[in-house]
């Protein structure tokens, strides 16, 4: 039985990259000088570096689509697929993909496949001879050589009880861009094709999970049926859907078990926590005021009452579509470490974008997707820096890599973080505390913005019943006795644990 045990999982998102291959018959060739071009990474490159990921503490990989993407531009990105049953030969073969999954399993790492039910690439083989008159939306316009109707991107039409029918139609049936035909899931043959395709990949590769791109864009009844069909076959499987909204009400709508006014049940176990991602950045960057700073994460976490299962939601500091977290936090290593400490102790499934562990950034051009997806150093012959071996990394990068490794390995073993209850206290004087508790194990997270030493009075946290207990600091091994107060000597994150 395929399953993705979400408890204790940490997802790492790499962009494929190690070698520099060109393949005859493929439209776009490798060119490392082109920031938005193919740089030649492949499946073997990931397979060869699994030891690095396991040592870091990663327990799952979400890789951008590896299916054939024979488009003339930006084909490395993967989301304009031209064959849903073929691995892109520039990445490798089906056998390479199966081998990757097998080797990952040996290391205790799950493979999450990135899938796209909403659209395909305009060079998909079936676009040359469409099997039905309604295989894609606005097909008549396409066949007449006309521009399609584009999506209005009004995702709220999925929930809006006042939405006009035309707005809902344009949202769901409109194309993203003219190179991404919008698939018509109302066609029963298309619906069956997409469901069977997902199940085939799960079974063939022994997938651990699926990340479904642009979840609100396809027909939502189909998406419920799609997820339901997979869960019927694999009851312990997990699927995460992308809803890029900063409104927790919209994100929560898509999670399985939500009490929606329209009765909609998605069968979707996990969604992506864009609201909390934004809260984390604002909480750390803002000056402490009554409605700014740490109050953003305090009140943001309070929104968990809306989610049927908060612990199954995927939280992340950044990904391949947004500025890197180190750039968002003004390249401040202390703030970036604080973000990691908070994110990795939350009642969530954390996902980290490759390079976060070495403070990769895109500050020279915020919003530039080429910089956001810069090659991981050490994957190509001739690289002067090798993050796999630490060769060429500066002091701050090495510190961050060790910091994150310590945190990830601790998280893997902490049952309080995996299964424990969460208690947090409203921030005061630039300090925020969150506790994770399971039986005798307690994990204490303290976030402190104060540049000068501050004395933290512990009487306020009496309900945690920690008095006279010994706690150990995760990062330096120092011990304290929880009694009257503790001194916070510097700005940053402190993690204390009752486990030695």
Question: Language-model features: where?
Answer:
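Carbohydrate-interacting/catalytic domains
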Residues: 1-2, 6, 12-15, 39-59, ...
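Active-site-proximal helices and loops of the catalytic beta/alpha 8
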Residues: 101-102, 119, 124-128, 197-199, ...
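N-terminal structural segment of carbohydrate-active enzymes
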Residues: 1-110, 125, 177
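The substrate-binding groove and active-site-proximal loops of carbohydrate-active enzymes
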Residues: 28-44, 80-93, 177-191, 208-217, ...
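Aromatic- and acidic-residue-enriched segments that line the glycan-binding/catalytic groove
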Residues: 13-17, 71-83, 117-167, 253-263, ...
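Loop/turn elements at helix/coil->beta-strand transitions in domains of secreted/extracellular proteins
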Residues: 54-61, 105-112, 206-209, 234-238, ...
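Conserved, mostly hydrophobic/aromatic
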Residues: 53, 63, 84, 104, ...
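Active-site-adjacent "subsite" loops/lids of carbohydrate-active enzymes
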Residues: 133-140, 163-205, 211, 215
